[in-house]
A protein has these predicted regions:
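A short, conserved alpha-helix within the catalytic core of class I
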Residues: 133-142
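A conserved beta-strand element that flanks and buttresses the S-adenosyl-L-methionine
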Residues: 125
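Conserved S-adenosyl-L-methionine
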Residues: 197-208
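Acceptor-substrate binding/catalytic loop of class I
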Residues: 167-187
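Conserved beta-strand signature within the Rossmann-like core of class I S-adenosyl-L-methionine
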Residues: 149-157
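Conserved N-terminal segment of class I S-adenosyl-L-methionine
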Residues: 1-113, 140, 181, 208-212
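Short catalytic micro-motifs in class I SAM-dependent methyltransferases
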Residues: 128-132
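C-terminal lobe and adjacent flexible extensions of AdoMet/dcAdoMet transferase-like proteins
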Residues: 215-220
Length: 220
């Protein structure tokens, strides 16, 4: 079953964020997690191989924006970098409230319209977010805009090497209604090569929950 983005958002608002205790997904009754349980269930360990490898890119910088932060696992992962100031960004107010209650600096906002000025953060990081977006162009452009030196994007669905992106992958084997896209490296590269704020970009393999890292160096 493929799902349009508007139907995906409607499903989530009517189920996870409605206070229901259970929901039906492809004919199965599934227990509805609380907002906190849901947020934590998608965090994974801060010691995941892919997280550790990506995190090595943070250490020389002083500020980071975590786009689509969820429960903000990277806040805990960067504690050894004493000079690095963390800010989380998530579109779900309930999740942001949970983070704030834990003392984590976090704001409500969309990756399509990041509520910060140009070059506000040394590093902008996003993990497992782009695949859920209706299009990759605007969120990537926004991350580049607010970054001063570096943008790091981790993909859990490995991008295609060439060809056109695939929209709305099948989600029948998931417990939730999920909106997934598989994007194309060649299409993303074309976008980056025409952006005068991009100095260079590189794809590399990751092990763990993430499959591919896109590293974008900024020139401003």
């Amino acid at each position: 079953m493929n799902m349009e983005r508007k139907n995906f958002e409607k499903w989530w608002s009517e189920n996870l964020f409605s206070g229901k205790t259970e929901y039906e997904h492809h004919g199965k009754k599934i227990q509805m997690p609380s907002i906190e349980e849901f947020s934590n269930s998608w965090m994974g360990s801060i010691l995941e191989k892919d997280r550790v490898k990506v995190r090595k890119n943070f250490k020389r910088y002083k500020s980071i924006l975590d786009v689509g932060c969820g429960g903000s696992p990277e806040f805990y992962g960067i504690q050894k970098f004493k000079k690095l100031k963390y800010t989380g960004l998530d579109i779900t107010p309930e999740i942001v409230e949970l983070n704030l209650a834990k003392g984590i600096n976090c704001v409500v906002g969309s990756a399509n319209q990041i509520p910060f000025e140009d070059s506000s953060f040394d590093v902008v990081h996003s993990r497992h977010v782009i695949e859920h977006m209706e299009d990759y162009k605007k969120p990537i452009e926004e991350m580049i805009r607010v970054a001063k030196f570096l943008v790091l994007i981790s993909f859990f669905i490995e991008p295609l090497e060439t060809g056109e992106s695939i929209k709305s992958l099948d989600n029948e084997n998931t417990e939730y209604e999920i909106y997934h896209n598989q994007y194309s490296k060649s299409e993303i590269s074309q976008l980056l090569e025409t952006n005068n704020q991009v100095k260079s970009h590189k794809y590399s393999k990751l092990e763990g929950q993430s499959k591919t890292l896109l590293k974008i160096k900024i020139s401003k």
